[in-house]
Design a protein with these regions (language model features):
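Sec-dependent signal peptide recognition
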Residues: 2-8
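Hydrophobic h-region of N-terminal signal peptides that target proteins for export
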Residues: 10-17
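Loop/turn elements at helix/coil->beta-strand transitions in domains of secreted/extracellular proteins
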Residues: 20-25, 56-61, 129-134, 154, ...
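Active-site-proximal cap/lid insertion segments
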Residues: 29-45, 61, 65, 82, ...
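Polar, surface-exposed loop/tail segments
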Residues: 48, 77, 138, 287-290, ...
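His/Cys-centered metal/cofactor-coordination and adjacent catalytic loops
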Residues: 84-122, 174-175
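Short, surface-exposed beta-strand/loop micro-motifs that present aromatic residues
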Residues: 123, 197-198, 404-409, 413-417, ...
Length: 518
């Protein structure tokens, strides 16, 4: 064979290999809870496109975020490392040490404010493997100099310091990496359209399209039309007569019912956005060779902030140490590998995406980088992986009532250790998924064994811990809790009942209310 023929053959093989490389679309939603989706039991929110995605691939029913708040989870997806190992253990901007002045027993630990440049992100690994890498939406894991384009993404549409949309969800907005659209344009749909445009222009090269929605993080905003739609739906479902929407749990009220029509409108827009991207994949024929991943960075907001949703039967939500704060929608669809409509009980966590993506891309794993993640490819193909425990460390107080704690989950058992006073909670999640019955006193040997494993992990990851606040006053703390239990509960009940009043309108100059974008 001539040198020319050999060269042509090599080129053809290279082109064919590139054509066979899988593409990746990664949907990361902000503050989306496990129970916020139709396929997980929500009857009030409407999410047909996300439900269809779940039905097309594998659902991980024990899928978890790496933390109960956003920045640590996001950094763990990017690095394959647990939060105490990469150092971002709280949302970037949260106060620490003596700057924390909320009459709590301990001072939150210090944490890292920028994604470490010495870490090789999953985007950098794919870029170095020949992929075009695209980012759209919320970043919130670094200040300028540590934005998506500084960590492996070749295109950045909207990722910067901030964790919520400056100016709100409807244009005009303020974002140095995303030009504001015409007045009334919805940011959620804009990000989806930017992603779809990227896919359209990238049909000849393998790509990673990472769509990180700002939604459904506050501010809670939707159109008048969508809000009215869900007011009518609430009436038909008999939800408007609720006198009690909240129950007090330790530090804050917790929403007990899904009936917020504004949040429901946001959920519908999120689903529409997912549908835009999925439709583009089908239109271009890339759906046959594109891995689609869908997850959230932490639980839904059941307490604090906008008190948006309910995640029952799980306890708590965003910021809190119970299942509502960390168990997430976790979907992986791999054409030709995953069987439609399948689910897995395997324990999975955010760090697992990194090695899973590399293996599916046919690229070498980087075990020294994604040290806390394992590839889920065997599970996706119907096989098993060795059993393991999952761990969390959050040495901070959450705005949503979370307490400084560390967690281990091993099989059906979950142990929570509280750094304020050393108390523990032990739950059997098979028998008690709502974490109602603390059985620590009944199983002292199990507590001891799990606590030893947790302590070993904390030492191995270099975890930082909170310190006692010398200013602490039990009297002031008790008064704070009592005020929240009474005045806050009453105000919330009144406000959230008003949301369902057909005559309700937002106060002030709320330009989002008049938008026609849906």
């Amino acid at each position: 064979m001539s040198k020319y023929a050999i060269s042509v053959l090599i080129c053809l093989l290279a082109v064919n290999a590139k054509a066979e490389q899988r593409n990746f679309v990664f949907f990361l939603v902000d503050d989306l809870g496990f129970g916020d989706l139709g396929y997980n039991g929500s009857e009030f929110y409407e999410t047909p496109h996300i439900d269809a995605l779940a039905a097309s691939g594998m659902r991980f029913d024990n899928g978890y975020a790496a933390c109960q708040v956003c920045s640590p989870s996001r950094a763990s997806i990017m690095t394959g490392k647990a939060p105490p190992r990469h150092g971002i253990t709280d949302w970037i901007g949260a106060k620490t040490g003596m700057d924390w002045q909320r009459d709590d027993l301990v001072l939150p630990a210090e944490y890292v404010w920028n994604l470490p440049h010495e870490d090789i992100t999953v985007a950098e690994a794919l870029r170095d493997g020949g992929y075009t890498t695209f980012y759209a939406g919320k970043w919130h894991i670094g200040t300028k100099g540590s934005w998506p384009e500084d960590h492996g993404f070749m295109i950045n549409k909207g990722g910067w310091d901030k964790g919520s949309p400056m100016g709100g969800y409807f244009a005009p907005w303020d974002n140095p990496r995303l030009e504001s659209g015409p007045d009334g344009e919805l940011l959620t749909l804009r990000l989806a359209n930017e992603t779809a445009s990227f896919i359209e222009s990238s049909q000849d090269e393998p790509f990673l399209a990472y769509l990180s929605f700002y939604t459904v993080h506050g501010p809670i905003q939707t159109t008048e039309a969508l809000r009215n739609k869900y007011v009518e739906k609430a009436e038909k479902m008999g939800l408007t007569g609720n006198d009690t929407r909240f129950k007090f749990d330790r530090r804050l009220p917790v929403r007990q019912v899904q009936d917020n029509p504004i949040y429901a409108g946001m959920m519908e827009s999120l689903d529409t956005a997912v549908g835009i991207v999925m439709a583009k994949l089908k239109e271009t024929g890339l759906d046959k060779n594109t891995v689609v991943i869908f997850t959230s960075d932490n639980g839904g907001v059941t307490t604090g902030d906008a008190y948006s949703t309910s995640l029952l039967p799980f306890r708590g939500g965003k910021g809190r140490q119970w299942e509502g704060g960390i168990r997430e929608p976790y979907i992986i669809h791999v054409p030709g590998l995953t069987k439609p409509g399948t689910s897995s009980d395997v324990l999975a966590i955010g760090m697992d995406f990194y090695p899973t993506i590399l293996e599916l891309a046919g690229l070498p794993l980087r075990p020294e980088q994604h040290v806390d993640g394992v590839s889920l490819v065997p599970v996706l193909s119907g096989k098993n992986i060795p059993e393991r425990a999952l761990y969390w460390h959050y040495p901070h107080y959450g705005n949503q009532g979370g307490e400084p704690s560390s967690i281990i989950r091993s099989k059906e058992w979950k142990l929570i250790y509280y750094h304020e006073d050393g108390r523990v909670e032990l739950y059997n999640l098979i028998n008690d998924m709502g974490e109602v019955n603390n059985v620590a006193a009944a199983y002292p040997e199990k507590v001891s064994e799990m606590q030893k494993r947790l302590n070993h992990w904390l030492a191995d990851t270099g975890a930082r811990f909170p310190a006692r606040d010398p200013r602490y006053s039990q009297e002031r703390f008790d008064q704070k809790i009592e005020n929240t239990r009474t005045a806050k509960m009453e105000a919330l009940e009144k406000q959230h009942a008003e949301f369902l009043d057909p005559e309700w309108e937002p106060a002030g100059n709320a330009r989002w209310w008049g938008s026609a974008e849906d």
